[in-house]
Design a protein with these regions (language model features):
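Tryptophan (W) side chains
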Residues: 3-6
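Arg/Lys-rich low-complexity patches in intrinsically disordered regions that function as generic
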Residues: 18-27, 54-60
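Gly/Thr-rich phosphate-binding loop signature of adenosyl cofactor/nucleotide-binding cores
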Residues: 53-170, 364-425, 440, 462
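Generic secondary-structure signature for well-ordered alpha-helical cores
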Residues: 174, 178, 208-211, 252-256, ...
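Terminal amphipathic helices with adjacent charged low-complexity linkers/tails
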Residues: 197-198, 205-210, 336-395, 435-436, ...
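Mobile "lid/hinge" segments at catalytic clefts and subdomain interfaces of large enzymes
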Residues: 258-358, 529-594
Length: 615
């Protein structure tokens, strides 16, 4: 692989790496001096800031403000333990040690810094020891909660999965992962129960079909989400596939972008359905038509959820497909150099956007990194079709694509192998995952659609799902995740089946999305679901610890059913136990149907309803 050869033969300084921006061409010594001077004066400010009042003594508080670890302002001195580990050795460099040493000497030989930090640069997390409940999160360290097996995240980047690729993924699951395989809401595949001894063979199989795991975790550019119908959609504005390929070829797996303040998430879509949750990414490229410049992308920045949710904001800038890769590269360097590194819970791109505003972000991007202005451009138009692509749809080439709904993204290697067989039988060589934990089979001849739908139905994958099967997502949960407090996949699957049965007597006016997360990190996007359930531990009246779920209601992203994105409201004091989840959601849904005004969706009702109606 290109990145593996590269990292073994070349040591690139992250400030002077390939394709230098205008900023990175500056003299290093001058930059270091300027950084030191600026650090003494405080964080960098835009040219438009108000000058200091004359003859006024500087504020002692401001003068003594702690550095935030911005490389371009404070220099490169590590300000926390994670930054020390990254400065000592890039996460990319652990790969040869995994292949040549740890796979032979075993789990117990792996040093802590590699195991709990650098392994992540290759998509590896130690999974949770079986049997540990949520209280262990407070009483045991990360290492103490770690089993001797790994979650392996496989980078897909929205790419088509050929039948050959799909069979390789299936073989990795069945041969090494105890038949586990989960589609994530970033279109990746996660396999559990991975032994370090098997990693060289797993990576060999992936690389033989053009797949890899690089930067699927860690403080690096994470795997991209992309429209799962890129290049085939009958309504597509612009195809992002060449842009993604250019970025992967030039920068993914290079040291220039492998030491960021935190993770950096990217999405691309040229489909008018807005099918990639663009409001939740660090940078988003959304297809639009410029009145003079033609098709291209509208740029958004600063999205993310977790405990401090922020929705991405438009920069108001337009780029063509030919410019998009360069702009992505420039933006990630802005984040690398100016992102806040001192506190990890304040180190995401959204906090830089919050501190600067999009006007300053765009100015720094253009002036310091691109060296030219970007064109102003239009905002995306409101979507008129659902973005989950479930069901049968036309392609631009006259063929069909069909979207199927696994239950909360859970598959298996056995099922993946049978999906490959069904797709091949239908004449397809193109299967894709979606950002909603769904699966598409593309390039199907019209006369083979019915047989494909029937074959997939036998695998438990339906093209015509009932409402909650279609609109429910869940994270990994306490089954494997060390951060989780509660279960997710199993209770969500039970809820889906029960709710679709219990509510078969009603007709919903639109989709009600139900997202379940096992902790506050919101990997399953709870704050932007109609009904979001966040796992937590609470006390019973008798003082016993129990699993419960905090409820968020009325969140959502722009869709064919919603004009504006927004976060859900929480219901004060409401804690729903696992046994009560189905009853609660059924009760809530029926109240919505009873109390809604004409043409009122669930989110609108949830935000105006009295709290008693939401309990």
């Amino acid at each position: 692989m290109r990145w593996h050869t590269w990292l073994l033969i070349k040591d690139i300084n992250p400030m002077t790496a390939s394709k230098p921006s205008p900023r990175s061409r500056k003299d290093a010594a001058a930059t270091a001096k300027a950084s030191t001077d600026q650090a003494a004066a405080g964080p960098a400010q835009s040219p438009a800031t108000t000058p200091a009042p004359p003859a006024r003594k500087p504020s002692l508080k401001k003068a003594n403000k702690r550095p935030e670890g911005q490389w371009a302002v404070d220099g490169h001195e590590p300000l926390n333990a994670n930054e020390v580990v990254k400065a000592a050795d890039d996460g990319l460099h652990v790969r040869p040690r995994i292949i040549d040493i740890y796979s032979k000497t075993g789990f117990d030989s792996i040093p802590e810094d590699d195991l709990q930090t650098r392994f992540r640069w290759w998509g590896l997390y130690t999974q949770r020891k079986p049997g540990l409940d949520g209280t262990a999160n407070a009483t045991m360290s990360d290492t103490e909660r770690s089993d001797k097996y790994f979650l392996q995240r496989i980078r897909i980047d929205g790419m088509p999965l050929s039948i050959q690729r799909l069979r390789v993924l299936a073989s990795i699951s069945t041969d090494f992962g105890r038949d586990t395989a989960d589609i994530t809401d970033r279109q990746n595949l996660q396999v559990h129960w991975i032994d370090v001894a098997d990693l060289p063979e797993i990576w060999r199989r992936l690389e033989s079909v053009g797949l890899d795991t690089v930067h699927t975790a860690g403080d690096a550019p994470r795997a991209f989400t992309a429209s799962p119908v890129a290049g085939v959609s009958a309504n597509e504005i612009v195809d992002p596939t060449p842009v993604i390929a250019e970025i992967r070829e030039k920068w993914i797996g290079t040291e220039e972008v492998s030491n960021l303040p935190r993770k950096f998430k990217t999405c691309f879509t040229g489909d008018p359905s807005l099918d990639v949750a663009h409001e939740l990414n660090d940078i988003s490229f959304v297809g639009v038509r410029h009145p003079e410049l033609g098709p291209g992308f509208d740029i958004w920045a600063g999205g993310g959820l977790s405990a401090n949710p922020h929705l991405a904001e438009r920069l108001g800038a337009f780029v063509t497909a030919d410019e998009a890769a360069e702009v992505w590269h420039a933006m990630i360097l802005v984040f690398r150099d100016y992102g806040f590194r001192r506190l990890r819970n304040k180190a995401r791109m959204k906090f830089l956007v919050e501190a600067w505003g999009v006007e300053k972000l765009r100015d720094v991007l253009e002036r310091e990194y691109l060296g030219h202005k970007l064109a102003d451009g239009p905002a995306p138009e409101a979507p008129t079709e659902p973005g989950d692509h479930i069901g049968v749809h036309d392609q631009k080439n006259g063929r069909k694509y069909v979207g199927f709904a696994p239950t909360v993204g859970r598959l298996s290697g056995t099922i993946l192998a049978k999906v490959a067989d069904a797709a091949e039988k239908a004449g397809s060589d193109d299967v894709r995952f979606t950002p909603y934990q769904k699966l598409l089979v593309l390039d199907v001849e019209p006369d083979r659609v019915d047989q494909l739908v029937a074959d997939m139905e036998e695998l438990g994958l339906t093209a015509h799902p009932k409402p909650f099967r279609r609109n429910t997502m869940a994270c990994t949960g306490i089954e494997f995740c060390k951060q989780a407090f509660t279960e997710t996949k199993a209770p969500a699957a039970r809820m889906v089946d029960d709710l679709d049965t219990r509510l078969a007597d009603v007709t919903l006016p639109g989709p009600i999305t139900l997202n379940m997360n096992g902790c506050p990190h919101s990997c399953a996007r709870i704050q932007v679901a109609d009904i979001g359930l966040k796992g937590q531990l609470t006390r019973t009246p008798e003082g016993e610890t129990q699993q419960t779920y905090q409820v968020h209601l009325g969140g959502g992203l722009v869709s064919s059913n919603r004009d504006d994105p927004g976060l859900g409201r929480t219901v004060r004091g409401l804690k729903v136990t696992p046994d009560d989840l189905t009853d609660y959601v059924e009760r809530l849904t029926r109240r919505f149907l009873e109390q809604r005004a004409d043409d009122e969706g669930f989110a609108q009702w949830a935000h105006r309803a009295e709290e008693d109606s939401l309990r």
